[in-house]
Curated annotation (Swiss-Prot):
Pfam family, one: CARDB
Compartmental location: Membrane
Presence of the UniProt keyword Membrane in the record: yes
Annotated family: To M.jannaschii MJ1506 and MJ1561.
Transmembrane domains' residue ranges: 6-26
Main location: membrane
Entry keyword set: Membrane, Transmembrane, Transmembrane helix
Protein name: Uncharacterized protein MJ0795
Length: 504
């Protein structure tokens, strides 16, 4: 009894299986390439085979999962085939497009086949794999398209902006009339992956100013076959039609390009300081002179040390023009000093150190003045003090000759020498005075630390009554004779007195 029950179950299972067994078979899917590339459109050919006579046959496709749905666009996703005899093939011609940014991945699509047999409707399906391996897209960019006349060492940026790997890369640069590639002009790179970059060092000799270009040729290999349809033909014999497709393997890619450069003089700008020497500890104007050898541009100049107030200024300078910018600075230490500046213009940045000489400034004053008079001659003695911050070299003090003041040798001038800050030197001057004089003009000359000749003028007042001397004796009083006579009289009186005392 139990055995009969088992046989009955097997019979029912086989009957049901016969009712749902497939009458078609998915034979293959063809897209005429080893791999699919992003951004390309492909013809898909899905072939089915019927085991029985079927009708109303329709084949369609849908992305199987979410990632496939995001990266595969169905352009034509359904094909009517209709009636098929037993063991007859049916081909569905469908069209898809791969997303331009599709990453390397084995995407999935599901092929469906709906048909009728008798009065029954059936549906079969199969999952197909679409391998997308990406397409390399090599781009060469200049990191700086500005060259100077003469030799230029530059870096070119080679980037694979595509989604596939490029292998056996070869780049060849070609000289032009005014731009020459020095050294080896051919570069090879084994491989460059997607979204990666590498630098190409290049030495270019530019002959003269202007805008010039060099051409380049780049070739590389895709690591898979890229079949490209080159010919399509149809042959019709009776009721049958044969379609012949011819493909060419395009896995070797060759491209050309142009790199354009602006060539300028060796120095885009010339920078000078109008006043390279300033005084220590004093707020001074620093005037920077800029000559534009480049092109009409707005210049922004920035200094980073010693500035007082604004440290950044801008000015528009035409090509060939020279203009000045003035900053206020203060430096509290003597010596040669560097002032770092940065100049921005037209996406250029130039950094320089401007050199200035910071010097002290001598300040000479007179002290300890003493005036002695003897007849018609004046003797002036005193000190010259340097109360400044700079050195005074070759200090010379002299009496200015006037109508009534005649300097007398060997003391008409006095050489003091070098006076350092907080140093002093003594001097002695002689002159002859005629007429009424109440002050004596003095001239002090010296050389500063930049060897510039400095002259200052001072006057010394005679602290007594105004000296009145005459060189002409006619009608005048001879004070020397009067003095001798007085002394003689005093002597005579003294001798008489001594004689009188002895007698007594």
């Amino acid at each position: 009894m139990k055995r009969l029950k088992n046989l009955f179950i097997i019979f029912i299972f086989l009957f049901l299986l016969s009712q749902v067994s497939a009458y078609i078979t998915f034979k293959n899917i063809d897209y005429n390439a080893q791999y699919l590339e992003p951004s390309k459109t492909y013809d898909l050919y899905i072939t089915i085979e019927s085991d029985k006579e079927i009708n109303n046959t329709v084949v369609y496709i849908e992305p199987t999962n979410q990632i496939s749905k995001e990266n595969i666009e169905i352009i034509r996703g359904k094909q009517w085939i209709g009636h098929l005899f037993p063991y007859e093939y049916g081909v569905a011609h469908l069209i898809i497009k791969i997303n331009p940014n599709a990453p390397n991945y084995d995407y999935k699509i599901t092929g469906y086949c709906n048909y009728t047999k008798g009065n029954q409707q059936y549906s079969e399906n199969r999952i197909f794999t679409l391998p997308v391996r990406g397409k390399a897209n090599l781009v060469i960019e200049t990191t700086n398209n500005i060259l100077k006349v003469g030799n230029n060492q530059i870096l070119l940026l080679l980037t694979n902006k595509g989604t596939g790997t490029a292998e056996n890369i070869k780049i060849e640069f070609q000289n032009s009339n005014n731009l020459m590639v020095l050294g080896d002009n051919t570069f090879t790179i084994s491989a460059l992956g997607s979204k990666t970059s590498t630098y190409i060092p290049l030495t270019i000799f530019a002959k003269k100013e202007g805008v010039y270009s060099i051409n380049y040729k780049i070739s590389y290999k895709n690591p898979y076959n890229l079949l490209e349809l080159t010919q399509k033909s149809e042959t019709i014999e009776g009721d049958s039609k044969t379609e012949t497709l011819t493909y060419q393997n395009k896995n070797i890619v060759e491209e050309t390009g142009i790199l354009t450069f602006n060539v300028f003089p060796n120095e885009l700008i010339s920078i000078n300081i109008k006043n390279p020497t300033i005084t220590v500890g004093k707020i001074e104007n620093l005037t920077i002179s800029i000559k534009n050898n480049y092109k009409d541009s707005l210049f922004v100049v920035q200094i980073s040390k010693y500035f007082i107030g604004n440290n950044q200024k801008s000015i528009f300078i035409k090509k060939g023009e020279t203009k000045n910018l003035t900053f206020q600075i203060k430096v509290d230490k003597e010596g040669v000093t560097s002032i770092p500046i940065v100049i921005y213009f037209d996406n250029n940045q130039i950094e320089k150190n401007l050199t200035i000489n910071v010097v002290g400034k001598a300040d000479l004053v007179l002290s300890g003045i003493d005036i002695e008079s003897s007849f018609n001659e004046i003797k002036i003695t005193g000190d010259i003090d340097n109360i400044g911050t700079g050195k005074a070299k070759s200090v010379l003090i002299s009496i200015e000759k006037t109508k009534n003041i005649i300097p007398k040798k060997p003391y008409e001038n006095y050489f003091v020498g070098t006076l350092n800050p907080d140093d002093y030197g003594s001097f002695e001057l002689h002159c002859q005075i005629n007429g009424n004089v109440n002050e004596i003009p003095l001239k002090i000359s010296y050389r500063d630390e930049d060897n510039n000749l400095i002259t200052i003028y001072k006057t010394v007042k005679i602290s007594k009554e105004v000296v009145s001397l005459k060189t002409n004796n006619n009608g005048g009083i001879n004070y020397l004779v009067v003095g001798i006579a007085i002394l003689f009289c005093v002597g005579v009186v003294y001798l008489i007195y001594r004689g009188f005392v002895k007698k007594k």
